[in-house]
Regions:
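Conserved ABC ATPase "signature" region
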Residues: 4, 19-37
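Catalytic Walker B motif of ABC-type/P-loop ATPase nucleotide-binding domains
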Residues: 66-69
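Hydrophobic anchor residue at the start of the ABC signature
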Residues: 55, 83
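ABC ATPase nucleotide-binding domains
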Residues: 141-158
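Conserved ABC ATPase signature
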Residues: 41-45, 49
């Protein structure tokens, strides 16, 4: 049912799903590899699994751009990695633009084709390797307890 909600903007006034709607839902389930979850209630699955179900709902909507707000929040590292690898795979396989906000900059550097970085005085968009070379991450946080190591592409706690 959650995934079918992605098709709601396309249903008739009764909310009935068409054959095309059902096909889009089935495609989203297949792309996200969640067939084993389709008969479970949302309170029977983990937070990581729920995030993937919600991504399937977004895929079922079949838009060219998918915007996700902090999709890895409250997930452990394993589920974060699984989710980000899925997003990367979906972007490449479906040719959709997937834009997500995150505070997990280290993971975004590893997993993103491009990043948009907001600082206090500018907004910069580029590939992660170019952003590292530009030094943008060095000025991101004004604290003596954190530094960005460009050699390894990660923040280090001092």
């Amino acid at each position: 049912e959650i995934i079918a909600l992605g098709r709601q903007p396309y249903t008739n006034w009764l909310g009935s799903l068409s054959k095309e709607d059902t096909t889009k839902i089935d495609e989203a389930i297949a792309l996200t590899e969640i067939n084993h979850l389709i008969y479970k209630k949302h309170d029977e699955i983990s937070d990581g699994q729920l995030q993937i179900v919600l991504i399937a709902r977004a895929l079922a909507q079949d838009t060219s751009i998918i915007v996700l707000d902090e999709p890895t929040t409250h997930l452990d590292l394993v589920h974060k990695a699984t989710l980000l690898k899925l997003l990367q795979k979906l972007a490449h396989e479906t040719q959709k633009t997937i834009l997500y906000s995150t505070h997990d900059i280290d993971l975004a550097i590893q997993m993103s084709d491009e990043m948009i970085v907001f600082t206090s005085n500018k907004i910069v968009q580029d590939q992660p390797c170019n952003l590292i070379q530009s030094g943008i991450f060095n000025s991101l946080f004004e604290t003596e307890h954190l530094t960005f190591d460009a050699n390894i592409g990660k923040f280090i706690i001092k």
